[in-house]
Structures are given as structure tokens and as C-alpha cells.
Regions:
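Structural signature of PLP-dependent enzymes
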Residues: 1-8
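Conserved PLP-binding catalytic core of the aspartate aminotransferase-like
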Residues: 2, 17-47, 69-71
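Flexible, glycine/charged-enriched surface loops at secondary-structure junctions
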Residues: 15-24, 56-59, 91-92
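Structural motif
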Residues: 28, 53-54
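PLP-dependent enzyme catalytic core of the Aspartate aminotransferase-like
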Residues: 38, 45, 49-50, 57-92
């Protein structure tokens, strides 16, 4: 759902190593993880392993998160926290 996608994008906005693409126009949020030193596939795999969060690897460094009506606000916050935590831990 578009509102949750916008919220997710906002939550990731100041995450070190992560760049959110401008213009969330649908229920998808695209973001780049190159600044974390990880590829999108590695980042995806760690999100699944560490937090059970499934976000697609769309390109070498580009991720695609898709929201829908069955994902709660708390779920969006949990996913954003997992992305932020992983990005920060990899920068240390």
C-alpha cells in the first residue's frame, strides 16, 4: 500500500550507507545499499538470516521493498529497523 511504502522510505531516509530513490509512487520502495559495502544479494540474505525480513535484490546494489495491505505499521517499522541496523553494523 502506498502510504506504508512512503512511510518505509521516510524511515530509511537518513540511514548511513543507504540511499532511497526519490519518488515513491506505488507500493514499492527502491533503495541502494552500495554505501554499506555489501551487494544487494548479500544485504538481502543477511536481512533474511538476521531478522526474517524479505526484501528483493533488484540489481547489484539496488533493493526493492514491496508493501501491501497485510503489512502493518509495526511490520514496516520492524523492516526499517532491520535495514538500518544491518547497514550500521556493516559500517563499523
Amino acid at each position: 500500500d502506498h502510504e506504508n511504502a512512503c512511510y518505509f522510505g521516510e524511515l530509511l531516509g537518513n540511514t548511513p550507507g543507504v540511499t532511497v530513490e526519490d519518488g515513491v509512487e506505488t507500493n514499492m520502495v527502491f533503495f541502494n545499499v552500495e554505501g554499506t559495502g555489501m551487494t544487494a544479494e548479500d544485504f538481502r540474505d543477511r536481512l533474511i538470516e538476521d531478522a526474517g525480513i524479505r526484501i528483493g535484490a533488484n540489481d547489484l546494489y539496488r533493493m526493492r521493498a514491496v508493501t501491501h495491505l497485510d503489512i502493518s505499521r509495526e511490520g514496516i517499522e520492524r523492516a526499517a529497523t532491520a535495514v538500518r541496523d544491518l547497514a550500521r553494523s556493516n559500517l563499523l
